[in-house]
């Protein structure tokens, strides 16, 4: 794109039109710019437009944003993105112009160009842009001399961005080369501008300097502190060790001085606090990483920070300062210099002057509780409050307890008693004191290793529960003091394993009652408490503490209240309520009396969310709830299946007909579950869906593939006769061939193939086997992966145990005569020992045993070595310790908070396919192995011990002897 008057007019008009509120000119302009972006020198032309003073600010700002985004996508595009990169000659011109243009721009445009410069720096600095740092330093020094702090701050902001990588990237030689270059060139100019600005602040402050003078100076110091953090993050540089006294002296001054001219306004106070918070980050880093070098400054900083915290108000605008300052004291408390806190009454004073004020509820907390219950729960129950005052203050106590556990326990216990006494004196006025006491107990409890159980030294849990928590839970008014109710429910949830079962059973009706609370937090906490109680394991036993019979007396009321709670404003898609529904349905006895209202309630919600799927976690638990209800109700009473179909089919058909992308994988999994529960013959509704499965269009979205495979397996299992009609099996195998050809879907292809082998007669599949083997062997030659190799071993094993070694060898030989020996030697033997999972190990071990004991080609004397090596692999497989083979699956994996519909596939745990053991009659593959080899050897005495001695590893020979002894079988 050539830079001329015509280009200027074209681009400026386009950028102006992108700001239009009218859709048509806006879209036309966006398309024109998108097309122009493919031309060489487009980025350069846009940058020149940004610098054109004749163009209005609004248009130039739009151009600056476009320039930044253009660089993001095209400076260094991913190799497979298909986006054409900016050419090197254009890059060099942009790098030559951008610094000077950024510094001369207005603040809004300067901000965009600084970000654009950072994009370039991320890829090119310093190696491919050696001129950048000298140019920044020269401009910084010139701007400082001129007192131009707009430019100073622009340069420091840019430097802060390009140096930021040193604070988060892993230590590598390349990173340290870059860091050394930056330190060698920038550490001295940084110190110079920091000290110069500091003297300007001192001068302005002493003469009553006005906010307009002080504001850019304080912003400059904050930026210097962020750069200091990045440059000091990896190691303590020699330069900063030599100049530590100057830096620490200034840091201490800003933490201990007041600046009334700025602090009298909220904006000015925020500016000062941001600098102080950045300083606290730096000294906290020094105490953690450079403790020895920093120790001379430690006492003064601890004293200054403590004093500062006493004066920091509860205003949310001061939260960042409060949390970073408390973090510093926490780091000191766990360091070797913790003796600073050993003095008389020090811990008591910290508790009273720092911890309690920061743990106590604020008006802002109450507002979040009432106005944004999801955010409140995330902070309070789910731990996203990691940087809130409440959490950080409790972390300080935990830090102190590292070395002074007895003193901390005594002080906090007394403080809890004081708070509770205050509440008792006037409950309606002092309810926040009780909330504070409960919060302290819950937050300072420690989780025991390897489980959800928690413990605390602050209180006797059962005593505290009976006297402090229980009265709240037994309150007849579920809507009074909702924050206290929520705190009490949280306490019960946290200490659920401590509450004896008989006591907890008396509480269940109270929890059911709290589901009717109007507060979204309270009914969410009640649901969460019930859900977590149902997961409690009985100590010393494998099962859960609470079973179906425990829920029966109040099950109907529980389900009614859960569904009613979903009608409260803003709880229509409450994930905690839906998760509780899912958990209860997974435990309770599902009679027809319960199943009817539940399926009605769930399908009503399902039809509603189909209109606008927006909460992936809620929707996942909704589908899990449907799946568990269908599974458990129909296991108990198969006659319910038709009623469930009547209820569910309208929603499932809506998902399919409207192509609701987010729900298609769930819909296919539910349909698979319904197909599996049916008895032959399947209704026409299902067969219509089966025909949809055969359409290539259905398989185009990768996220649908696992669910479609699951559904196809269900049809192969339940309607094998229908599947083989009208050339349908050929279409199914076409799907298999497409899936197995790709490493990303080959496992899914094997699921289909294995299901065909398990459910169709050999006479039906025989005509297709040459094509199947050809597809598999082609894949072996082209893209061999460990996953594919294991899947193929399992498939060959399944074929053998279902249809016999003769048919296995015969069908393989249609591809190439006598291929079986090559497959055994080069593929089966090396990959057999990779198999994991108890059922898979049994299947492959038994199949391999039958292969060497029944296959003529392997029993031939010329194949003795092959026979021995295969036996060696079998012994390796069956001798491996059980824990190496497979890990226990959790009952139900937790759904991640960031689960989304863009994920490839989200499995429904409760609609999972039941794995059938194809070898139910064989209990022990080890016994089968030695018995089979023993029988074989008895027919040819003396032959096999020699083969074993020559071909088995010594460890496997020993293992085989041990197995023979264990099962009383000999090898003659």
Curated annotation (Swiss-Prot):
Transmembrane segments: none annotated. Residues 29-104 form the Importin N-terminal domain. Keywords: Cytoplasm, Nucleus, Protein transport, Transport. One of its GO terms (cellular component) is nucleus. Its main location: cytoplasm. It is found in: Cytoplasm; Nucleus. GO terms for biological process: intracellular protein transport. One of its GO terms (molecular function) is small GTPase binding. Gene3D superfamilies: Leucine-rich Repeat Variant. It comes from the Eukaryota. SUPFAM superfamilies: ARM repeat. Belongs to the XPO2/CSE1 family. Export receptor for importin alpha. Mediates importin-alpha re-export from the nucleus to the cytoplasm after import substrates have been released into the nucleoplasm. Binds with high affinity to importin-alpha only in the presence of RanGTP. This is Exportin-2. It comes from Arabidopsis thaliana. The gene is CAS.
